[in-house]
Amino acid sequence: ALDRIGDTLGIGGIFRGLRTIPVMLEYCRMMEKVCPDALMLNYTNPMGILTGALQRATNVRVVGLCHSVQVCATNLCMMLGLPSDNLKWQIAGINHQGWLLRISRNGEDLYPEIRRRAQLPENRGKDDVRFELMKRFGYYVTESSEHTSEYVPWFIKAKAPELIDRFQIPLDEYPRRCVAQIEAW
């Protein structure tokens, strides 16, 4: 798989894991001594690599979580031009594979309108990978289209480069984010 974000899979994720696993193992060793029944909530990338390593190498209970969960519903509504106040939502999943199971505003189920707006031409290119998964599975995935395309091999295939254009997957997403972040600083 191509590593568009740079900290998940492939060579970027492997090297980031090699730097981060030893530090996280130290934390887990301390937890084994001080609070052996505690649950570690890991928000650190590479999520899958770290969570798996800690589960295999320690006795600490570890769950991988993604920060996208907290902003998923609000960002989805804002992107589609829906009011984002008074939202109630329910998400289930682990690591970078959370799913927005329910979303409502003032008691009204927003999924029918979200599905309708996701198909509008003006929303083409905004979040095509996630919209495709929503069409196929019925739910919106919490992680960005770029990250999701790293985990789901349907979207980027060496023998089907037209998928990159079809789903408008930016292969330079991580460098673009870094430049924007540096400029903001």
PLM regions: where:
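Acidic, His- and aromatic-enriched active-site or binding-groove loops in soluble protein domains
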Residues: V60-L76, L80
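Rossmann-fold NAD(P)-binding glycine/threonine-rich loop
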Residues: A1-T58
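Short acidic, glycine/serine/threonine-rich loops at helix termini
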Residues: T51-R56, N75-C77, L101-I103
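Long, compositionally biased stretches enriched for glycine and/or charged residues
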Residues: M78-W185
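A structural signal for short, well-ordered beta-strand segments and their strand-loop junctions
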Residues: M40-T44, G64-C66, I91
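Short secondary-structure capping/junction motifs at helix and strand boundaries
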Residues: D37-L39, V63, S84-K88
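Glycine-centered flexibility sites
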Residues: G10-G13, G64, G93
